[in-house]
Amino acid sequence: MNRRPLALLSMLALMQGCNPVDETQPDALVEDPATVEQKVAVSGFAELHHHMFAEEAFSGGWFHGSHTGTMVSCDGGAPESDHARVRMDLSNMLNLCPNSGALDLSGVPVLNSMFGVGGAVASEFIGKIEGTEGDTGLHLGRKQVNTQWPRWDTIAHQQAFEGSLRQAHLGGLSIVTVSLVSNGFLCSALPYQNLKRPCDEMTDVEVQIQMAKDFDARTAWAEIALSPAHARQIIASGKLAMVLSIEVSKLFGTKDWRSELNRFYNLGVRSIQPVHQLDNRFGGAALHNAIFQAAQFLENCHIDTDCGVTGPGFTLGFDVDANCRNVKGLTAEGKALVQELMAKGMLIDLAHMSERTVEDTVALTRGNTYYPVYISHGHFREVMSPDLAANEKTTPASVIRYVRQSGGIFGLRTAHDETRDYTRTPIANSCQGSTRSFAQAYEFGRQGLKVPMAFGADLNGFIQQTRPRFGSYGACSAGFKAEADAQAAQQRVSGPPRLGTDFDQYGLAHVGLLPDLLRDLKQLGANTTGLEGSSETFLRMWERAQSTRTGMADAAADIDTSGVATYVPKATREAQYPQICGKAYAPSSKVLGDTCRFNEECVSAKCTSLDCGNITGSCICDGDNDCGAQQYCGWGLNTGTCQNKKAKGALCSNNNECLSNNCRWTYTCG
C-alpha cells in the first residue's frame, strides 16, 4: 500500500537535511504580527502532559500512592499485592481470536512474557527496561518512598503527588495540562481483586475529573482554567493554571459523541486527543509498542503481513503499508469531531495520531485559516536513535512545520532514551538518557526546527523519564553498561557539578523536579529562554484558536534538519571496550563503594565480586593511597574501607593509623 503525501514528505525532508520540503500553500497568507493583540506576557513554563490523577486510571488497579495525603511505602509487590502486576492467566485473552494459534511470539519478548507467563514474572519484565531495575512485579527493593521510589524509572508508583506539583509551581511551573487517562486493555490485564470498578475508560475519566475539581476546591495555589483569559487571571494571582485534557483510546465510548463532547466541555475539559494507543471510531493511531499492537489484535484479530512491526514479517492488529505506517486516517466521525472542536475553540492534540490521521487533521485545520494544533508529548524523529525513530509515533520535521504554521507548540518528552548527537550545540552527548541527551533533542528543536517548546513529561504515564548524571541509580544508562560506567565517571570529572537536589541521583523522579531539569539544561549551556516562557506561548496558541485568524502564524520556511550526526550502533561502540569473561567494562570507572564486577573497573583496582562478575561486589581500598590524606585503608573487620586517622592517645597497631604517623610501643598514637 502506498503512503499518503505527508508521510512521503516527512521522509524526503529527512533526506534533504537543510533543504526540507516546502509544504506552504501557494496562496497562504502569513498574519501580520502587528494585527495580533499583544497582551502582557505571563511568567513561567508549561508542562503539557501530566497524569496527576492516574491512580484512578485502569479502574484504579495499577498505581501505588495517592496524589494527595501522605506518601507511604508500598508492599513491594508481595502477593497478593494491590498494584504493579498483571494477571497470571493472560494467555486466555488470545483465545478471543481464532487465528491466535498461528502466532509465534517467541521473537517478541514482552508479548511472550506477558501472554506466555503472566503474573509477577511478566509484570517485572514490563518494568525492566535496559539500564533499570524496574519497579513492577515483585519489587522488594523498591518499597520505600523517597529513597527507593519515585525514581526516573518508576512506572507503577506515584510521580504526581500534590506536594511535588507545589514544588514545581514554586520553581516556575505556571501552566499544567492535566491529562485524564486510561486504557481498557491494560485494565483488563490486571488482577480482578485490584480493580475498583469494571473497566471503562470514560468512567475513569469522569472519576479523574471529579478528583481535579476536588483538588481545585481545596487548593489555594492552583485552579482549573476554562479559557485563556481565565488562565491569565489565575497566573496573575500567583496560582498554577490547570487545563483539563482527555487521553483515551475509547473516546466517548459508543455514545453519541456530540452530546458527550458537550457534556465533557461543560465539565471543564478544553483539550482533546482524538486517538490514543489504538484505532478508534475517530481515526488511526500511530504504532509504537508491541503491547498495544496485541491489544489492537484482540479487538479485530487482524494479522498484517505487509510489514513486520510486531515481529519478523507480521504486525498485529493494525493495517499497515509497506513502510510500517498505519493506513487508517480520520473517519467521517473523526472529521466531524475535529470540526466541532474548532467550532468550540478547543485545543486539538495531535499526539499518538497515525501519520495519515495527522494529514487528514491538518487538511481540516489548514482549511480553517490555520487553526492551531499542538503535540502535548512527543519526540523529534530526526534526532532519535534509529530504533525509536522508526516508530510512527515520533514526529517528523514535516509535521513540526505545520505546528509552527498553525501557531502551535510542541511538548518535548523528558525521555530516558538515547539521542543522536546534534552538532550545532556545544553540549556533549556524553551521558546517554540524561539531561545531556535531552539537550540534543531540545537544541535540535530550538535551532533546527525552530519550534516553540514546553515540557511534555508524561509523568504517571506508564513511561520512564530523564536518567540522572550521577549516582548509582542508572546514571547515563541508555546505552550499555560499560558505556554508562565510563560516561558516569566522566560526569564526576568534567561536570557541570551536581545541583544538590534529588535530581542528581534519581533523575526526573516526579513533577517537582521539572525545575531542576530546566536548571541542569541551562547549566549545560542550553538557551532555555523559550522553554522558561512557554506558558505564554501556550496561551497565545489557545487565544489564536478562539480568535479571528487571517492566515499562517509563521511561514516556517527556515527549518533546517541538518547537523544530526550519524548514529553509531551500540554493538560497534561496545566493541571498543576491553572485555573480561566476555563482558565489556570501563577501566578505572568506579570509585570506592561503587558496585563492580572486576578489579579493573575500580580506581583502587580492588573489587569484592565473585564468579567472574556474576556476583557483583564493591570497590574497596587496597592501600592508603586509595584513601584521603587524613585516612588509612582499614584491616580486620574494616578491611577495604577507608578509616579516619586517629588523634594522640588513641589505640593503634600501625603508624599509618595515626595523624602523627607514630604508633608507640604502647599501641597508642603519639
Whereabouts are the PLM-identified features?
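Bacterial N-terminal signal peptides that target proteins for export
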Residues: 1-7
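Bacterial signal peptide processing site
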Residues: 19-21
